[in-house]
UniProtKB/Swiss-Prot annotation:
Gene3D superfamilies: Glutamyl-trna Synthetase, Domain 2 (1.10.1160.10), Glutamyl-tRNA Synthetase, Domain 3 (3.90.800.10), HUPs (3.40.50.620), Ribosomal Protein L25, Chain P (2.40.240.10). GO terms for molecular function: ATP binding; glutamine-tRNA ligase activity. One of its GO terms (biological process) is glutaminyl-tRNA aminoacylation. Monomer. It catalyses: tRNA(Gln) + L-glutamine + ATP = L-glutaminyl-tRNA(Gln) + AMP + diphosphate. A motif ('KMSKS' region) lies at residues 268-272. This is Glutamine--tRNA ligase. Its EC number is 6.1.1.18.
Amino acid sequence: MSEAEARPTNFIRQIVDEDLASGKHKSVHTRFPPEPNGYLHIGHAKSICLNFGIARDYQGQCNLRFDDTNPVKEDIEFVESIKHDVEWLGFEWSGNVRYSSDYFDQLHNYAVELINKGLAYVDELSPEQIREYRGSLTAPGKDSPYRGRSVEENLALFEKMRNGEFAEGTACLRAKIDMASSFIVMRDPVLYRIKFAEHHQTGNKWCIYPMYDFTHCISDALEGITHSLCTLEFQDNRRLYDWVLDNITIPCHPRQYEFSRLNLEYAIMSKRKLNLLVTEKIVEGWDDPRMPTVSGLRRRGYTAASIREFCQRIGVTKQDNNVEMMALEACIREELNENAPRAMAVLDPVKVVIENLTTGVEMVTMPNHPSKPEMGSREVPFSRDIYIDRADFREEANKQYKRLVLGKEVRLRNAYVIKAERIEKDAEGEITTIFCSYDPDTLSKDPADGRKVKGVIHWVSAEHALPAEIRVYDRLFSVPNPAAAEDFLTTINPESLVIKHGFVEPSLAAAQPEKAYQFEREGYFCADNRHSSAEHLVFNRTVGLRDTWAKIGA
């Protein structure tokens, strides 16, 4: 990571500065605690950049800890993908990877301590009854009939829960706090529930599993976390976080701070809804280039640096706000405009025959970047038969159309001026071939007689071009806030993926997966990291040359 990316300013960093200056903490210790029940998305990337970035900038530590307390929804596949995403984004965690399940024995002991203090009880209400008894924002809850059990009875029942003597959903351990609290999270929250499921780390050792709110704070304390950073939806949960730590024997009491979550327009961040997109086969998988997942963005052609830059630009605040998709797209567009080598690709080809070109193949020198000579150049074959894009030719056009028109001239990029003389069509009236002449004295220079040729179009040699599948990706949803729709699936953009079969210049034969290029006049593309091969080239559009959605929203 470059120095330019370092040291942003936000309210959390101000808190860290104050804590270090006052001596409250001698060093900084943060953590990133994802649940391994799905792939990380751009919202997680914001949290990663915040937690790991603070640890890096203050020469502290940041743990990677998996909040693995629900074996039913978790999988080792997600564990491995999350580790890969964190490393790909450019960060390293401190020490070994940690798991909340590492602390299951200690968590059980702390639960027993709460029971012994009369602060937890085994409840045999059904989950539906617990919800009913909890009350609402306007009505207080009411006590469970099992709330008054003795310490001895609760200890015995909790042991039975651990031994598998209760069926799932028939008993749970709850904190004894205040059923009339104005904060619903404090109305005797569940601490442990029963799940007969094999755990990816602990196997079948446990059939009771701690809840997030009980696990999270204790794990932070056991690891000596100094600043526990969460998104705003956990603001009320801070009361429970502090209550648990205040009522058990543990030397460390971290402080939780909340920041705004990332709400990205034209995207969905809910894991449940993202999973639905996958299971309903609306997308190819979690790494579909239209998904807001880190793996999807990577496959689409986003770089780690562009995602870090985006997270720095949007900042860290206490107020939820919506971020425009164009802000994310601008970060990768700016980077690729600066760094991506140029290449020519024809997405919707029509054949051009240059009738007065009698020589064989000529190699034309092209710069890899128009403003960076240090990136070198390449030799591109030019021959009698070429392909141009169908949109670059019209039989008739007005003066604003600066491409190839029947009877008029246009320049081929870094090559010659050609003139459309006649066309050939098939039985359906579709143009199959454009017959042209060329001016042999115009290789990368103006005509000698001073005539003006305004348009420039790209091309590839028909003999040497490589067939390629070109996937033109766009925003997955057609409205800025798909989550607000009654059925978010009805807002899917039908044009979010358009597959074209075109041709690319031969220099792209060995394009490496995720390698970015600017296809001149088309946009930024990369070789697909799943399907592209030397035998079958597949390129994904990362982003267009300019923001076309800005016109739609105007």
